[in-house]
Amino acid sequence: KSINRDYIKYDATIQNMINHRKQMQEDLVKALENNEFMMYFQPQYDVLENRIAGFESLIRWNNPKYINISPQEYIELAEKNGLIIEIGNFIVKDVFKNAKLFEPYGIAISINVSPAQLFQAGFVGFLLEEFEKNKLKPGSIAVEITETFLMENFSVVIEKLNILRNHGFRIHLDDFGTGYSSLSVLYEIPANVVKIDKSFTDKVMVDNKGEFVSQMGKFIRAAKEEIVVEGIETEEQRQFLESHGFEYGQGYLFDR
């Protein structure tokens, strides 16, 4: 509906969107009951040594109605209605079991963790329990958080991440460069890896944007952290990584 002084005009588009989200919320509950979620592992590639160096776990909804929509849409809805906790627990259990299979190759798998999960009472303990239950070795699992995550409650986030790192988890800082934190955060967060956001990768071949990304890499390396450049989709972008000393890349060029 749109309001214009003396009358209200019905807007079918808005109503359809409301109905769509309501239906999706109902289907999310059924999806958990019917085991419709599955995990997909996107490789993080070592462009210098030409090998797979790690994987990021990504959730997919095996339902004809939602198979082609971005996971971000239903994950955001799950965060709002509280289902993210149950979905997150499924992800942890599935990924930790798979991580055991990759251990002999020295390859870590990362899981994306939302603020709702990390701030949930007992979540860190749950991660530690599953880690122990699957008899995983230190370095087998990486917890991935976004840069904007740090704005929620910085000191609490750092405390929880330190606990995880001290118990053998790797820490990945995702979407770096898209938030409002200063470069000093690189020295405060206990991260092993910083992931440069795709929005920067898209522009490395435009004007002097590549030089900016190169300088960003120098700051990150100065903080003693590894770098994964996200959104690598072309051979030109891969060559940029190699020529500027970026060791790891992730994106559709390596695997869809």
PLM region spans:
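Catalytic core of bacterial c-di-GMP phosphodiesterases, primarily the EAL and HD-GYP domains
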Residues: 7-11, 17, 47-56, 81-157, ...
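Conserved functional hotspot residues or short segments at active or partner-binding sites
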Residues: 160
